[in-house]
């Protein structure tokens, strides 16, 4: 295992097309990168979604031995196996309900239920699994996490049909409601293409950096702009030239190649 460097990647829109499986074309640059650095996958999704989308890499590839899994913004940390007989080991996790207290958590859930009922008047499809509590964060998906690709596309079309996108309007409203009840101790961000992430202040993706204080960290993600869930960690590492914003898996390929070359040059 490389102790000096680790490159952290967002998942959806970075290593995979949104809500789809790992792009196998990235095996080539990632294998080259792994000679010089460990790999981390930091995502707002929970472990089950990460495992499902990244199965080709973390179950059936030798890269599993150098790849850290950091679901829920890195508030959970799964250490890579040391040999072919081992599995990933959960070595750190946090609990949002305990951190905020039962009353604040209950208020949050009530706000999200109200917001979901209000969103039902729009013309996008409704499926199921609208609110997902992941231990250290809450994900609210108005179209439902059970939505098919086609249903997600319909939601995006409705979202973007307004002069101010529907999710951005809802984001402002939701932040106002949450701050009134939780004294500005809770953050609400856009999550991926269709949802919202809700978590305690400070539990954004910069949390993942706390697991690697003895290493140089890089980050590659696609949601690095205002309201995006990659913004904080991107901004933090960009100050040192180690934050990269990608437009998709093809761009990620080029970024990995650049980081690898920089690491090689650094050793010369």
What does each model-found stretch correspond to?
Residues 7-12, 71-74, 81-83, 134, ...:
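Short loop/turn segments at strand-loop or loop-helix junctions that form parts
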Residues 123-218:
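Conserved acidic, metal-coordinating active-site core of Asp-based
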Residues 47-48, 76, 144-147, 194-195, ...:
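Short, solvent-exposed loop/turn segments at secondary-structure junctions
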Residues 3-8, 24-37, 177, 181, ...:
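A short, Lys/Arg-enriched amphipathic alpha-helix followed by its capping loop at the start of a domain
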Residues 21-127:
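Active-site phosphate-binding/coordination module
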Residues 21, 45, 135, 193, ...:
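Short beta->alpha linker loops
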Residues 2-6, 22-23, 197-268:
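Mg2+-dependent phosphoryl-transfer enzymes with acidic/Ser/Thr/Gly-rich catalytic loops
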């Amino acid at each position: 295992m490389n102790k000096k460097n680790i490159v952290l990647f967002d998942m959806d829109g970075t290593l995979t097309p949104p809500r789809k499986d790992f792009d196998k074309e990235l095996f080539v640059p990632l294998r080259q990168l792994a000679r010089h650095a460990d790999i981390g996958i930091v995502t707002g999704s929970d472990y089950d979604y990460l495992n499902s989308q990244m199965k080709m890499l973390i179950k059936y590839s030798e890269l599993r031995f150098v790849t850290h899994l950091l679901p829920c913004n890195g508030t959970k940390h799964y250490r890579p196996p040391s040999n072919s007989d081992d599995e990933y080991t959960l070595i750190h996790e946090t609990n949002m309900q305990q951190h905020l207290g039962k009353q604040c958590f209950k208020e949050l859930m009530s706000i999200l239920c109200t917001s979901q009922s209000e969103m039902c008047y729009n013309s996008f499809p409704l499926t199921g699994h609208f609110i997902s509590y992941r231990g250290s964060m809450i994900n609210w998906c108005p179209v439902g996490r059970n939505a098919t690709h086609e249903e997600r596309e319909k939601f995006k079309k409705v979202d973007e049909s307004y002069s101010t996108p529907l999710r951005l309007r809802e984001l402002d409203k939701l932040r106002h409601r949450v701050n009134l009840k939780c004294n500005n101790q809770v953050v609400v961000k856009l999550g991926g293409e269709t949802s919202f992430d809700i978590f305690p202040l400070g539990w954004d993706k910069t949390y993942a950096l706390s697991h690697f204080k003895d290493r140089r960290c890089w980050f590659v993600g696609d949601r690095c702009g205002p309201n995006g869930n990659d913004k904080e960690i991107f901004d933090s590492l960009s100050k040192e030239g180690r934050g990269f914003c990608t437009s998709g898996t093809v761009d990620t390929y080029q970024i990995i190649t650049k980081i690898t070359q920089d690491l090689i040059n650094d050793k010369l």
